[in-house]
């Protein structure tokens, strides 16, 4: 079941979260029930009629892949966290980072069109259908960012259960927004009062309504009455120009609607997941646009790729000009 893909998902999710909401209004939180409902929703999200074990749709291959992936990442992160005080060498950091990214790299290689007709098959299905799972990129971004923060020493404490919670948080598991571990744990530790939770619920309701408007009304109309007719005749500059803008608007309203749903359900858990969009089409320039479009991903690349590349070049004095180093870091950021 695709998260936020149909009304059935919303109905099931809201029923499952009803005890969470009731406890929230009482100024309480059950970490045990939160864990149970998260596990239930993850099983539902990864359910599959085609690729499963023992002909059980809820025992899907994607679910098994996800569990193995989470165990892999938790073992890597906890190993690095506990061994860092004794040995914080660059080689160990790189090794852990490579091992963390390895599952995603494997999935991307298997998905690549470079393989063409040479895709590896298993029982008449592509191997990639068994290896990957929905949201592997965004979960990997979380793990990589966490390893970097351990390296920097900005994270002082990591508990296994909190780490699993962070990686497998179901509202944002498929396509973000990408949260930060310290911010997530801070919200998770602080149980809001009844009045504070009431404000979160009101904001969540507003975002869900706005998300329905964006994704199921505006995006639908753009796709039905602009994109699909234009696809029938893409000859000529005007049609190509109209198609480009129509598709850009469709992407925004579809993805922004999804992001609003993800943030709203996060709020119902008492987790204030950061926003993903801030009126991107009002941007004054390309830099301002990327600071408004898919912000959590843009900021992730800025903090984890651009700033670190620039800092490394500055420390090693690889180039004399700060401007040149900034441009190189910018190119590395966009290449990745």
What do these predicted regions represent?
Residues 1-336:
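Membrane-embedded transmembrane alpha-helical bundles that form the catalytic cores
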């Amino acid at each position: 079941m695709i998260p936020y893909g149909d009304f059935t998902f919303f109905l099931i999710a809201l029923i499952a979260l009803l005890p969470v909401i009731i406890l929230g209004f009482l100024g309480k939180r059950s970490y045990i029930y939160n864990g149970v409902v998260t596990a239930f929703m993850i099983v539902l999200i990864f359910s599959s009629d085609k690729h499963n074990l023992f002909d059980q749709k809820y025992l899907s291959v994607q679910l098994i892949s996800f569990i193995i992936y989470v165990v892999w990442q938790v073992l890597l992160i906890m190993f690095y966290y506990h061994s860092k005080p004794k040995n914080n060498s660059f080689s160990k950091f790189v090794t852990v980072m490579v091992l963390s990214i390895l599952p995603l790299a494997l999935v991307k290689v298997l998905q690549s069109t470079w393989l063409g007709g040479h895709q590896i098959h298993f029982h008449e299905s592509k191997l990639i259908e068994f290896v990957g799972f929905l949201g592997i990129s965004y979960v990997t971004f979380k793990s990589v960012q966490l390893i970097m923060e351990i390296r920097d020493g900005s994270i002082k404490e990591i508990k296994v259960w909190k780490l699993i919670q962070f990686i497998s948080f179901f509202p944002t598991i498929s396509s973000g927004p990408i949260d930060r571990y310290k911010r997530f744990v801070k919200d998770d530790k602080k149980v809001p009062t009844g009045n504070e939770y009431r404000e979160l619920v009101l904001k969540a309701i507003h975002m869900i309504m706005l998300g329905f408007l964006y994704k199921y009304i505006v995006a639908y109309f753009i796709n039905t009455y602009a994109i699909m007719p234009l696809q029938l005749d893409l000859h000529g500059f005007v049609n190509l120009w109209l198609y480009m803008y129509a598709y850009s608007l469709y992407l925004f309203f579809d993805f922004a609607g999804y992001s609003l749903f993800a943030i709203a359900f996060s709020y119902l858990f008492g987790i204030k997941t950061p926003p993903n969009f801030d009126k991107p089409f009002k941007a004054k320039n390309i830099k301002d646009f990327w600071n408004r479009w898919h912000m959590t991903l843009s900021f992730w690349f800025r903090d984890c790729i651009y700033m670190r590349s620039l800092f490394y070049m500055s420390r090693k004095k690889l180039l004399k000009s700060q401007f040149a180093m900034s441009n190189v870091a910018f190119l590395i950021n966009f290449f990745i």
